[in-house]
C-alpha cells in the first residue's frame, strides 16, 4: 500500500473549497484564502492539496512507528464518519462531548474506563440476574453514558501519538490539552478558525458532510498504510499487494452532481421568493442542503432538473435557476 491519493477535483466535488461568510473570517487564515464569491470565502486548494498530503504522511509515519491516532469530531455531521474511520483503521475516536481532562487527566479517565469495562462484564454475564430489573436499568444507563464518551478510547491504553480534529473551534479544549502534552495535531481548519498551534494545518470546509467523509476516509487509509508498513518492516508476510477498494464518498440523499451544505452559511435566503416555492418546497430544498440563491444559480440544466424532480416540480427548475442568478446579481 501507499499514502492514499486524491485529486483537486475530488476536493472540489466534496465542497472543500467553500469557507464561511467573509465577515465571519479569522484574519489569521488570510494566507489560505483564494478570494471571495457572493460574500463566501473560497479556500485556496492549491495549498490544501500539499498540506493534506503532508498530514496523511504524518499519520502513516506515526502508525508505522506503532503510534496511536485519536480522531476527534463531536459535531453532528462528523460523528458517524469519525467513528467509522477510526474503527476501520484500528484507531481511536471521540465523537460525543469531549470530557475535560481526557488527555491531561488520563489517570481519572482510566478509572472511568475501568468502570465501563466492569459494567460490560456485569451486564453481559449471568451476574446481571442478581440485580432487580430497576437496578439493571440503572446500570445499563450508566454504561451507555460512559460508552458514549469513552467507548472510542477504552482500548487506547494510553495517550495518543497524534490527534486528528474536525473543526478546531468546537474542539478547542481537546486541542489545548494536546498542546500541553506536546501531542501533534492534524486538523481541518476553516476560514473562521485560528490555525495557531496546529501542527499539520489542512485548510478546508469543516461543515459539509461529503468533505468530512473525504477527510476521514483519507486519514483512515493513511493509518492502514502505516499498519501495513509496520507489518512489512517487522518481517510479517502481508501477502501480495491488493488494490484497496475505492469507496464512493456518500452523497446522502442528494442528487448526483450536486453538493449541498450541512447548514446555511450565515442567514439562509428566503427561497419562497422563487416562483412556485411554498414552505413545504423550501423545506425539501433545505433537506437537500440548499439554503442560498447562489447554490441554485450555479446549477447546470441536468442537475437543476434532478433537483426539481427531488422536490416534485421539475418543470420549474430552469426558472428557479434564472431567478436565483438574478437575485444573486442584485445582491452583489
Curated annotation (Swiss-Prot):
Molecular function terms from GO: structural constituent of ribosome
Keywords: Ribonucleoprotein, Ribosomal protein
Pfam families, sorted: Ribosomal_S2 (PF00318)
Entry GO terms, CC: cytosolic small ribosomal subunit
Family (UniProt): Belongs to the universal ribosomal protein uS2 family.
Listed PANTHER family: 30S RIBOSOMAL PROTEIN S2 PROKARYOTIC AND ORGANELLAR, SMALL RIBOSOMAL SUBUNIT PROTEIN US2M
Name of the protein: Small ribosomal subunit protein uS2
